[in-house]
Every structure is written in C-alpha cells, then in structure tokens.
C-alpha cells in the first residue's frame, strides 16, 4: 500500500485537489512523520508485546484505516481524506519493521541472505503495485483508498495463510 501511495500521491494532491507543490511536500512530509512516530512506538511496544501481536494489530489497523481512506476519498474533501490517509500510512510503522524482525529472527544463521531476499521481495511487490496503480490510472482519492485496502487485505491473508499458523502467540 505504501508504494501505491508514493506512486499516485502527487497526481491526487496536485491534480485532483489542486494544491500547490510546496503544500504537497508538507503533506508528504507529515505522512512520513506519522510513519516514523509509529515505528518508534512499535519499537517500544516490542519490549512488552510479542512481535506477532503487533503485526496482527498493524494489519487490522491498516485494513480499517484504508477503508476509511477509501470511504472519505469518496465523500469528503482534502482534509478528511488526508486525515484517513495519514493513519493508513502510519500503520506501516507496525507492519514493516515487525515483518523484518520476524524474518530475521527466524533465519538468524542466514541473516544476510534473509535480508537480501526480504528486500528483493518487498521491492518486487512494490514495483508491481506501482505498475498496477499507474496502469489503471488510480488518480482519485477513493481509488487510492481502495488500492490500499486491497493491498492490506492481501497482506493480512498472506499473514494468516503463511505465518500465523506457525507462530506462537
């Protein structure tokens, strides 16, 4: 969902909403700040909660927030859409570092190889998502919200099928 946002954020904010490039830069930075804050909170919470629990929380919140992004993208203006989008982007602070931690923990002996494979997979999926949102001209707020929700649901499904059954809670 992150690369769907990165790919079409400028055309949506500048083209659809008609904001100035400088304001877009501030909004993009604000959304990045939300991601950084939740990453810091996630790191602190990993001392008290199992990483798998934080990942479940992040995935559920991503689906909920992306749903609000889609819904508000259909019915509201810039402010409502941006608030929902901010929280959708911020939930990645629970997902991205935690999936990396779990992958590295499971393959500690081969951490370098595991890291390389994980990076390759992440950027391959990101490239595919970027291609798809570009190909299908996802240039409206509701379409971005829908794309992010689809990505979140696919991620949650993969988590349930591939990871959840093997992890101790």
Predicted regions and their residues:
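Helix-to-loop junctions at the C-terminal end of transmembrane segments
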Residues: 38-52
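Small-residue hotspots at the loop-to-helix junctions and early N-terminal turns
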Residues: 21-29, 115-116, 145
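A late C-terminal transmembrane helix in Major Facilitator Superfamily
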Residues: 101-142, 147-148
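Transmembrane alpha-helical segments of major facilitator superfamily
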Residues: 26-35, 122
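Multi-pass alpha-helical transporter architecture, strongest
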Residues: 146-169
């Amino acid at each position: 969902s992150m690369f769907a946002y990165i790919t079409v954020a400028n055309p949506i904010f500048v083209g659809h909403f008609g904001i100035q490039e400088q304001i877009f830069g501030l909004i993009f930075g604000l959304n990045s700040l939300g991601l950084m804050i939740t990453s810091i909170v996630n790191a602190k919470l990993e001392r008290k909660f199992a990483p798998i629990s934080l990942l479940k929380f992040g995935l559920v919140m991503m689906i909920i927030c992306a749903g609000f992004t889609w819904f508000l993208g259909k019915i509201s203006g810039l402010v409502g859409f941006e608030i929902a989008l901010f929280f959708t982007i911020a939930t990645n602070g629970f997902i991205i570092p935690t999936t990396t931690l779990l992958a590295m923990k499971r393959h500690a002996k081969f951490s370098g190889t595991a890291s390389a494979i994980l990076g390759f997979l992440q950027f391959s999926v990101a490239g595919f998502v970027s291609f798809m949102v570009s190909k299908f001209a996802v240039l409206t707020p509701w379409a971005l919200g829908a794309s992010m929700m689809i990505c979140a649901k696919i991620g949650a499904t993969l988590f349930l099928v591939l990871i959840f059954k093997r992890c101790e809670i």
